[in-house]
Amino acid sequence: MENILAMVRDFGLFHLQWGQGIMILVGLVLLYLAIVKRFEPLLLVPIGFGGILSNLPDAGLAMSAIENAVYAAKPEVMTAFSEVLQLSSYMPADIKQALSSATPLQMTTLHLLAEQYQYSDGMLYLFYSIAIASGAGPLIIFMGVGAMTDFGPLLANPKTLLLGAAAQFGIFTTVLGALALSSLGVMDFSVAQAAAIGIIGGADGPTAIYVSSMLAPELLGAIAVAAYSYMALVPMIQPPIMRALTTQEERKIQMQQLRQVHKLEKIGFPLLLLILIALLLPSATPLLGMFCFGNLMRECGVVERLSDTAQNALINIVTIFLGLSVGSKLMADKFLQPQTIGILVLGIVAFCVGTAAGVLMAKLMNRFSTTKLNPLIGSAGVSAVPMAARVSNKVGLEANAQNFLLMHAMGPNVAGVIGSAVAAGVMIKYVMG
């Protein structure tokens, strides 16, 4: 009878905390949005499921061996940990606080101690360490995106590169906004955290994950969820801004058909882009290097098998583990913070400012050019590929049934991918030194 009662007391249900319950509901909401509403299902399904797994009571799937040991709080383990950390207190809360300032040697010793007491790293923690903490996951995704990208529309109309650059204004505006909130005492964001939040404005999930994992890993869950949620909401967020900033006549502008781009141009462009960026901004080289490599495999025509693997099987496999890894950061004690609200608000501001900046840049360019651009393609400067370009095309068709802007909008859309990677390099360079 005692054994049965002990087994019942060990049921996770009796150890469920209110925060974990809320985050399990958040995970279910993400799954609902992905499955029923089709909001970025490729990422939100694994993120939502990972969020549920990481909040299951007593499972410890998203915690390291050290964190699992502290959570269990066995007296003999806490005594050993406090000796390593040189603490007078054996309380788990004090030990947990001391871990944030522990030296690498102390962390290594604690990890070995935890393993000696039969504690191990959780499954999701291992996924995170391999896929995100190492930086490998987002970089492989970028290679796959490069293999799927056609630079033809950008090369056929190079001035659309300016639209992609203008849309990154949302990133830097949001960084300043986050710092302003901190200075006013509304929120408490460090410079590194502000930079990581700002990248949401690039509408590029892999870049947001890459930058936040380097600058503010504690905010990774909220930043990734915000980035992919707002990317899915591009068809709802952008059209009102586009219509507000353009006249009916501007939306009716029909653009000239793009010229045919020579294969040699497509092969040479990723090489030239990589060399140029590497010489000017080395910190952006990892992202753009993998992006350009993927694109070169696509365009060179001699490695079809590698190109096909990069843009299909490989990117799909990595997406699964990347999503689960992001889900591991949706633990209640890390996600249910006042900062999360600030991130969600700043993220939507970043999207809106980036969209508006692209449209306004197109209007400005029209003042100095005889060949008119339809300002609607400026909104595609955010790097939500190809959703933003499709939105530009849809709004254009509403104004003029003969106005097909999709291929024209792909130019600034692809430029936005380059722009967000460059912006990420700038953030990493000046925040990390």
UniProtKB/Swiss-Prot annotation:
GO cellular component terms, A-Z: plasma membrane
EC number(s) on file: 7.2.4.2
Function statement: Catalyzes the decarboxylation of oxaloacetate coupled to Na(+) translocation.
Cofactor(s) this protein cannot do without: Na(+)
Catalytic reaction annotation: oxaloacetate + 2 Na(+)(in) + H(+) = pyruvate + 2 Na(+)(out) + CO2
Broad EC category: translocase
GO biological process, one term: sodium ion transport
Annotated localization: Cell membrane
Protein name: Probable oxaloacetate decarboxylase beta chain
Membrane topology field: Multi-pass membrane protein
Keywords tagged on the record: Cell membrane, Ion transport, Membrane, Sodium, Sodium transport, Translocase, Transmembrane, Transmembrane helix, Transport
Tagged with keyword Glycoprotein: no
Protein family per UniProt: Belongs to the GcdB/MmdB/OadB family.
Superkingdom of origin organism: Bacteria
Transmembrane segments: 13-35, 125-147, 162-184, 189-211, 215-237, 267-289, 309-328, 340-362, 404-426
Subunit architecture: Heterotrimer of an alpha, a beta and a gamma subunit.
Organism (species): Vibrio cholerae serotype O1 (strain ATCC 39315 / El Tor Inaba N16961)
Molecular functions (GO terms): decarboxylation-driven active transmembrane transporter activity; lyase activity
One Pfam family it belongs to: OAD_beta
